[in-house]
Amino acid sequence: MFVSPPPATSKNQVLQRRPLESTNSNHGFASSLQAIPENTMSGSDNASFQSLPLSMSSSQSTTSSRRENFVNAPPEYTDRARDEIKKRLLASSPSRRSHHSSSMHSASRRSSVAESGSLLSDNASSYQSSIFSAPSTVHTQLTNDSSFSEFPNHKLITRVSLDEALPKTFYDMYSPDILLADPSNILCNGRPKFTKRELLDWDLNDIRSLLIVEKLRPEWGNQLPEVITVGDNMPQFRLQLLPLYSSDETIIATLVHSDLYMEANLDYEFKLTSAKYTVATARKRHEHITGRNEAVMNLSKPEWRNIIENYLLNIAVEAQCRFDFKQRCSEYKKWKLQQSNLKRPDMPPPSIIPRKNSTETKSLLKKALLKNIQLKNPNNNLDELMMRSSAATNQQGKNKVSLSKEEKATIWSQCQAQVYQRLGLDWQPDSVS
């Protein structure tokens, strides 16, 4: 009966890792395998088969010696070694860390392969895995820590150009209902059409409103950079911070002290009143959306932008109305002056015109006065004297042309109505008292 040798399977490898009682049992196992008749297989097969027990015996004896010489380290030494290795990894550069991790990982792989047949391979692999079990995880953690720790070493941006300071996209500043309602109402820059107004210096101050940001960019650090413009005649620009989670007082103060329409020289009281009204309206709308009354509004980006644009529109309309009012008042004064200086026929003053009974009414005093005037001005006749007197009177009247309160109130109301109608606003002009 032919008996074949057991195949070298994983089961056989597991059996090799089981502890052996003594060296004699190894020889017994080898002798039992050698008892197979030689005539049942060829010579080459027999030679290779006889060499198998010898290699297994030598491998098992080597493993036994390694087991006797191996000493398990106490847990505190293991933890201390692990901490020391981590410290060295953190102190090394990223390239050295990756090279060190790969070399240690390959070394651990070679060690596990060399000791695959040993009885203590499981213990050794578990000891190695406790330190280098997840090199990718350690590398990821080191990368994150190094990126955070190395960022302050980079030079922070303290000066930016106007193009770099302005936002590149605007889709998060407006609700989807506005952006998706009618594509024809969207400008080429992605903003709605109502952000473009035919008002005095609107484009300039719209750019200034876009420089109000809700958060700092990472490359700015903890401070707002300076906006650089080219040219001496360029207007002033600066970045302002207004977080989404801000109190009403912070929002009002930021709007009032902004650079919006600084050239119009609007009075502080008007800007403060306009900012308070804008924030109060936004609070009512926020409470209607959220259904709760918050001490500090946690605004969304569209709500936040809506507050800025409403305040900008209020002061822009006021600046436009005041500009139109000054022009209308100047034009009205010129018209009144022209009406008062209409050309009249060249006639002497009424006191000089002789009456019908001049011979009876003229006194000697009047005759003497007229004679003295003619004697003092022998080269000028009476008509020239009358024209000089009329010119002096007109010059005095020109300096005294003014408008009454009723006239100013009427002109102001007309300017407001024209601006509101031109912009399509349903606002009501101030009533004339």
From Swiss-Prot:
Q: What InterPro entries does the entry give?
A: Std1/Mth1
Which residues fall in a compositionally biased region of kind Low complexity? Answer: 48-64
Q: Where is the composition biased (Basic and acidic residues)?
A: 77-87
Gene Ontology biological process terms, A to Z = D-glucose transmembrane transport; signal transduction
One Pfam annotation, family name? STD1
- Region (Disordered) spans which residues? 1-117
What spans are recorded as compositionally biased (Polar residues)?
Answer: 9-47
Q: Which family does it belong to?
A: To yeast STD1/MSN3.
Q: What is this protein called?
A: Protein MTH1
State the taxonomy lineage. Eukaryota, Fungi, Dikarya, Ascomycota, Saccharomycotina
* Underlying gene: MTH1
